[in-house]
UniProtKB/Swiss-Prot annotation:
Its EC number is 3.1.7.2. It comes from Vibrio cholerae serotype O1 (strain ATCC 39315 / El Tor Inaba N16961). One of its GO terms (molecular function) is GTP diphosphokinase activity. This is Guanosine-3',5'-bis(diphosphate) 3'-pyrophosphohydrolase. Interacts with CgtA/Obg (AC Q9KUS8) in a yeast 2-hybrid assay.
Length: 705
């Protein structure tokens, strides 16, 4: 029982005698179940579950969690069933052990799929009972401590998985001590040489800093004693992985990171925190822009503290965190601080526990709308390490977003419907680009319009997984709706004098059956997406090719499909020729892209008369309602200010420039290629006339192909 005694010493500090006895019984079952089994390192297997349970006991977790930790491998590795555990220890312990075991049982085609699906399963188990992930994190820690016994490739894989998933999860749940240990062990296993070198230089640097650390410590402590503010002042050392990350991601030099002297001041009440802040600011010159109040507005993982940055003795940077004892516990243990497990409840609990519960609920929504495990893991990873900003709604509600979030992210954070109908934003009462990042303290107002729909381009700049998932969801629906609408138009056009509604039901049923397509909507969607040709389907539906429209022989406008330019995401204007209203146009259906419109003179569609079935006669309607992009080439003298004059002239015509490039022809001349917006050929002719009046413009022409 000597192994159990090491766990008992910690657990008896907060568990009752009957609970310790119940824990001992769990240990005996686990010990007997693992009899004769050893770890990769050669040590008896039972050492591992005891180490896991001890980590959780140090976090003061409840009896059921400690029992499940001792038993977490018995279902997987031994002849013990979930029913056995239920009979001996109750359903709660059995469910916890089963939840942890299931994460390791899954079999997949490849390692990448396994990691993605395992992660999805882990998150779902965590949403059911957060203790599952606490056991999993505690399980990972001793595994990382004993990595030395594994093959180098396996060691690297586990270390990378730990740094990418488990350490960020511990951070997101606010469990600082586990997060720090996992990062250090993962860093050492993945990059042993970098770890060793960095450890040596950090050790040397810390030795040189002792005198300055002692001086700042004494000055802060002395000032607080002078004014009668009892406090505990401790120096903070950055861990090696944190230093390495800053050097890599922020491209900071080693001495820049090590030159910062960091301290933590722990006091009794939140009110004292602010009084201490005033005293340290009177001692050293503060940097106002670097002051952060995480007490009034806690971080996403429940972390609370005042952060301030100051200029210390001899100009050295001094960083101070000020917090209460409770906040210090929370910063170290996160959701496990003041542990009291309440199933499916947000009522009560610490800030960290409530925020974790909300976060996990949002993960459940992500899982339900994600297309697959890879999409899910991509979305959740973006939420694991958020540097937060805090912005306000016009009514003063605080909205917490990750750093880099845009007005679109804000809109979806407020409500899905607001995000879906967003057409613009005002920040601090001023128009603000949807793609531009927000900053803390801004007041954001979303301009929405009924009937507006998400834009696929938003996916290029949103940063929250919620926004990304909701946008993809709507785009999938839009794509289907648009493909059905376009498919109906294409089929009606191919049917000539007939329409889809006139086709006999038995004909439709036969075609659907022959093609193994479930419904008419699916058939229309396949036509709209270019997977089936409308002319072929029309022939099969009618059974009489003579009644069909022949696009190549129809000179009259009545057989041309009208184009407005706003048909949806399944109508594309070809980039090779940039057609605009009043151009003679031709179209073809491209698989997956829908209808692609070209100018008739475009080299890419020159052979359309030879393959009439692949092309469709189209024409512009009179009520097109958008701007179109086209391309101009301008030959100019190489003179200072000529390019600026060109862009100014284009701007005055009401056109926007979407792209611009230059090509030097010789020392005196160059050609400017401009992508710009225009309403139609008349508008474009006006733009070209204005350019021709420029003194440095020699020739302006529209790109032919």
């Amino acid at each position: 029982m000597y192994l159990f005694d090491s766990l008992k010493d910690v657990a008896q500090e907060y568990l009752t005698e009957p609970q310790i006895e119940a824990l001992r019984q769990s240990y005996v079952v686990a010990r007997d179940a693992h009899e004769g089994q050893t770890r990769s390192s050669g040590e008896p297997y039972i050492i591992h579950p005891v180490a896991v349970a001890r980590i959780l006991a140090e976090m003061r977790l409840d009896l059921e969690t400690l029992q499940a930790a001792l038993l977490h491998d018995v279902i997987e590795d031994c002849d013990v069933t979930k029913e056995d555990l239920d009979a001996h220890f109750g359903s709660s312990v059995a469910e916890l052990v089963d939840g942890v075991s299931k994460l390791d049982k899954l079999k997949f085609r490849d390692r990448k799929e396994a990691q993605a699906e395992n992660f999805r399963k882990m998150v779902l188990a965590m949403v059911q009972d957060i203790r599952v992930i606490l056991i999993k994190l505690a399980d990972r820690t001793p595994n990382m401590r004993t990595l030395g016994a594994l093959r180098p490739d396996k060691k690297r894989r586990i270390a990378r998985e730990t740094l990418e998933i488990y350490a960020p999860l511990a951070h997101r749940l606010g469990i600082h001590n586990i997060k720090t240990e996992l990062e250090e062990l993962g860093f050492e296993a993945l990059y042993p040489n970098r770890y060793r070198v960095l450890k040596e230089v950090v050790k040397a640097a810390r030795g040189n800093r002792k005198e300055m650390i002692q001086r700042i410590h004494s000055e802060i402590e002395g000032r607080l004693q002078e004014v009668g503010l009892p406090a505990r002042v401790v120096g903070r050392e950055k861990n090696l992985f944190s230093i390495y990350n800053k050097m890599k991601t922020k491209e900071q030099r080693f001495h820049t990171i090590m030159d910062i002297y960091a301290f933590r001041i722990v006091v009794d009440t939140a009110d004292t925190c602010y009084r201490v802040l005033g005293q340290v600011h009177s001692l050293y010159k503060p940097r106002p822009a670097r002051m952060k109040d995480y007490i009034a507005v806690p971080k996403a993982n429940g972390y609370q503290s005042l952060h301030t940055s100051m200029v210390g003795p001899h100009g050295v940077p001094v960083e101070v965190q000020i917090r209460t004892e409770d906040m210090d516990q929370m910063a170290d243990k996160g959701v496990a601080a003041h542990w009291s497990y309440k199933a499916n409840s947000e009522r009560g609990g610490t800030t960290a526990q409530i925020k974790a519960q909300r976060w996990m609920q949002s993960l459940l929504e992500l899982q339900q709308s994600a297309g697959n495990s890879f999409e899910f893991i991509e979305n959740v990873k973006s939420d694991l390490f958020p540097d937060e900003i805090y912005v306000f709604t016009p009514k003063g509600r605080i909205v917490e977003l990750p750093m880099g979030a845009t007005a679109v992210d804000f809109a979806y954070a407020v409500h899905t419907d607001i995000g879906n109908t967003c057409v613009g934003a005002r920040v601090d009462r001023t128009p603000y680009p949807l793609s531009q990042s927000l900053k803390s303290g801004q007041t954001v107002e979303i301009i929405s319009a009924p009937g507006a729909r998400p834009n696929a381009a938003w996916l290029n700049y949103v940063v929250t997984s919620r926004a990304r998932t909701k946008i993809r969801q709507v785009l999938k629906t839009m794509r289907r709706e648009d493909s059905i609408t376009l498919g109906r138009r294409l089929l009606n056009h191919a049917l000539g004098e007939h329409s889809v509604n006139e086709i006999a039901p038995e004909n439709i049923s036969k075609v659907l059956s022959d093609l193994k397509i479930a419904s008419m909507d699916d058939l229309l969607a396949a036509i709209g997406l270019g997977e089936l040709m409308s002319i072929v389907i029309a022939r099969r539906l009618l059974g009489n090719a003579d009644e069909l429209t022949e696009p190549s022989k129809s000179g009259g406008n009545k057989n041309k499909l009208p184009i407005r330019g706003a048909e949806g995401i399944l109508l594309t204007f070809a980039n090779c020729c940039h057609p605009i209203p009043d151009d003679h146009i031709i179209a073809h259906v491209s698989p997956g892209r829908g209808l692609v419109v070209h100018r008739e003179t475009c080299p890419n569609v020159r052979g359309y008369q030879k393959e009439p079935d692949k092309y469709m006669a189209v024409e512009w309607t009179k009520d097109y309602d958008q701007e179109f992009i086209t391309e101009l080439k301008v030959d100019m003298h190489n003179r200072q200010g000529a390019l600026a004059e060109l862009t100014n002239v284009i701007s005055k015509t009401g056109s926007n420039i979407h792209g611009l490039s230059t090509e030097e022809r010789d020392g005196r001349l160059y050609t400017v290629t401009v992508l710009l917006t225009t309403k139609d050929r008349v508008h474009l002719a006006g733009i070209m006339r204005k350019i021709r009046t420029m003194p440095h413009a020699l020739k302006v022409r529209r790109r032919k192909n």
